[in-house]
């Protein structure tokens, strides 16, 4: 009998082992769809981004008008741009759900997979930030100025570092050029990191909603989960295309329709919605260095999660107190997101400060304590 090329060919064998014959737990729920959705998001963003880059000019005098030209004069340029801009939002929606799933079901106990995932999140955040600067509108310019300026809080080398990043003494043409180069490069880095992420995942196999070893009950990835993933793609593309076609500017800032002007500061400088929770934490501390450290900690805290797991059970499926705490954390993040979009005045300042303290308290203090408490409850 001739050998099956799918199982013998050096390249196809790898594809087969990760997408076709991959043994998968039979009980993984729709929360496990977001990984593949992130892959689709990445491919969509790279494709639309490549098409946009063909019509974009990375120069301060031409960037804004080149984006306008793409939308007005390029065949379906408006659609490509709208899909790319809103695709970024969906990318972040998916990654936040994906991280939430990992937190809830204890997937972080696969430490290598979790850590590469956090690095992926940081790279994605960097990519989205440099990408937001490219249209060279008011919010692009001032966002770049404010966020890069945060590095000046680093003692001793801060100011030098910022001027080195800018390529001058303010955000200008060199900054835009290098941000475009970075925005082109980073998605391919994300693609490479994704392969490492998957390599680590396939070492251990997928986790499942019960958090127990599922080797005795695994099914092939294809056709069961390929079909389930296609359903997921459809359910994601539907709202994405609806948003891109009917209300493409819903999530954007109107300020970005004004070309960048270093002489006029917008009344409210704020990032895109997916960074607002971190921005709120940054603003909550009335000290530059303290704020920057809290901002960094708000994301880097994810690296600590595996070490703070004190429960005997892996998932929260049978841990009601931890579940309650988890949903309080979700609500807290939504409050931070809302506060980040509001002006810096009473009562938003105190709400932001309380929500910031709550965020770190839940993750660093309450989760381990409740985990240990639930271990005690198992004895009764």
UniProtKB/Swiss-Prot annotation:
Transmembrane spans: 34-54, 78-99, 114-134, 179-199, 227-247, 289-309, 321-341, 348-368
Membrane-protein topology: Multi-pass membrane protein
Cofactor: heme b
Keywords: Electron transport, Heme, Iron, Membrane, Metal-binding, Mitochondrion, Mitochondrion inner membrane, Respiratory chain, Transmembrane, Transmembrane helix, Transport, Ubiquinone
Residues the entry annotates as binding heme b b562: 84, 183
InterPro entries with a match to the protein in the record: Cyt_b/b6_C, Cyt_b/b6_C_sf, Cyt_b/b6_N, Cytb/b6-like_sf, Cytochrome_b, Cytochrome_b_C_euk/bac, Cytochrome_b_N_euk/bac, Di-haem_cyt_TM
One Gene Ontology cellular component: respiratory chain complex III
Subunit-level organization: The cytochrome bc1 complex contains 11 subunits: 3 respiratory subunits (MT-CYB, CYC1 and UQCRFS1), 2 core proteins (UQCRC1 and UQCRC2) and 6 low-molecular weight proteins (UQCRH/QCR6, UQCRB/QCR7, UQCRQ/QCR8, UQCR10/QCR9, UQCR11/QCR10 and a cleavage product of UQCRFS1). This cytochrome bc1 complex then forms a dimer.
Protein known as: Cytochrome b
Species name: Pachyptila salvini (Salvin's prion)
Gene: MT-CYB
């Amino acid at each position: 009998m001739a050998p099956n090329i799918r199982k013998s060919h050096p390249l196809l064998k790898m594809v087969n082992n990760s997408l076709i014959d991959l043994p998968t737990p039979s009980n993984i729920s729709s929360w496990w769809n977001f990984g593949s959705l992130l892959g689709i998001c990445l491919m969509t963003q790279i494709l639309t981004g490549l098409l946009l880059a063909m019509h974009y000019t990375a120069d301060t005098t031409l960037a804004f008008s080149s984006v306008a030209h793409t939308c007005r004069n390029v065949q379906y340029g408006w659609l490509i741009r709208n899909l790319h801009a809103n695709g970024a939002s969906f990318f972040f929606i998916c990654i936040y759900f994906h991280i939430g799933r990992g937190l809830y079901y204890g997937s972080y106990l696969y430490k290598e997979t979790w850590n590469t995932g956090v690095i992926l999140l940081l790279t994605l955040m960097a990519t989205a930030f440099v990408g937001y600067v490219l249209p060279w509108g008011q919010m692009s310019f001032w966002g770049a100025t404010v966020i890069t300026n945060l590095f000046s809080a680093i003692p001793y080398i801060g100011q030098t570092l910022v001027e080195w990043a800018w390529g001058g003494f303010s955000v200008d043409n060199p900054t835009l050029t290098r941000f475009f180069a970075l925005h082109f490069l980073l998605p391919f880095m994300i693609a490479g990191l994704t392969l490492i992420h998957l390599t680590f995942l396939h070492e251990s196999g997928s986790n499942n909603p019960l958090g127990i070893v599922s080797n005795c009950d695994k099914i092939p990835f294809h056709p069961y989960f390929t079909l389930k993933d296609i359903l997921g793609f459809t359910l994601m593309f539907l709202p994405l295309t609806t948003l891109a076609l009917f209300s493409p500017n819903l999530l954007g800032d109107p300020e970005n329709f004004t070309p960048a002007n270093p002489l006029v500061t917008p009344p409210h400088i704020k990032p895109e919605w997916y960074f607002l929770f971190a921005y709120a934490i940054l603003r909550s501390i009335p000290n530059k260095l303290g704020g920057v450290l809290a901002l960094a900690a708000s994301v880097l805290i994810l690296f600590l999660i595996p070490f703070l797991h004190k429960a005997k059970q892996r998932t929260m499926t049978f841990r009601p107190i931890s579940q309650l705490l988890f949903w309080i954390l979700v609500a807290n993040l939504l409050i931070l997101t809302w506060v980040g979009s509001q002006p810096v005045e009473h009562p938003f300042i105190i709400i932001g400060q309380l929500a910031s303290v709550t965020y770190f308290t839940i993750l660093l203090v309450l989760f381990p304590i409740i985990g240990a408490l639930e271990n005690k409850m198992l004895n009764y």
